Amino acid sequence: WLDRVNGVTKEGGNIVSITMLSGKTYTGKMFIDATYEGDLMAAAGIDYHVGREGREVYGEEWNGVQTTVLHHRHHFGAVPKPISPYMIPGDPNSGVLPRISAEHPGNRHEGDKQVQAYCYRMCLTNDPKNRIPFSEPEGYDPGQYELLGRIYEAGWRETYDKFDPIPNHKTDTNNHGPMSTDNIGFNYAYPEASYKHRREILKEHQTYQKGWLWFHCTDPRVPKDIQEKFKTWGLPKDEFTDNDHWPHQIYVREAR
C-alpha cells in the first residue's frame, strides 16, 4: 500500500521513488499507475477530476447531471406501475424508504462530485454439483429492500436480464433494473477516501449485495417463479476459493 501522504519522491517533475506503508521504497525510471483509484497519480500531484464535469467546462452536451435522461432500463420508467417512495405509501411526512435519497439531484448539465455506482460483478452457477447456496449475510435487514419489494409488487420482472452466460454453467452477473446489485449513492466518498474508509465502503457494498441475493431467496414479495429460479443459483465452488467464493475486486466504474 502506497504511503499516500509522504510516499512519492520527485525530481524535476518526475517520480524517482515511491514508499509503501510497510516502509519499502522502490526506485525506477518510469512509474505507471494502472489502478482503479489512481492513488499514485494523486500523490504525485497530477491534475484529475472526481465526478461529473459541467457541460460548460469542455462544451460537451452529455456532461454533467442528466435529469430526465434514462438509460438501459435502470430506472423506474421500466416499472409498469408507479411506486410510492415513502415509508407510508402516499404520505411524505412518513419519510422516504431506505436507499432513497431526498436530496435534489441537481440541475441538468451542472457538475457534481458523484460517481457512477459500484457493485461486485458476480460469477454465479446453476450447476447443482458446483453450487454453494446463498446464505443470510451478517447484518441483514430486510427493511433495506422495501423498495425492491414494491418494485416487484408493481409488476417488474427483469431479474435475470444481466445473468450473462459464460462457459461451464456460469454467469457474469451485473446490475440491471431500478434496484439491483449497484449500491447507488454509497460510493461517492470512495475515490478520495482513506484506506480504512474504503474498506468500510467495500464492506457496506458486500452486505448490501449479499442481502439483495438473500432477499430474493426468502422474501414472500418476490414472485414465486422468480424466487424458485433464484434458489437454483449460487456461488461456484471453484471460483475465488481463497475469498469465500466472492469476487476480490469491486467494479469501480469510475473514480479519479
What spans do the regions from the language model cover?
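Flavin (FAD/FMN)-binding glycine-rich loop and adjacent Rossmann-like elements that form
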Residues: W1-L2, S17, K24-M30, A34-R256
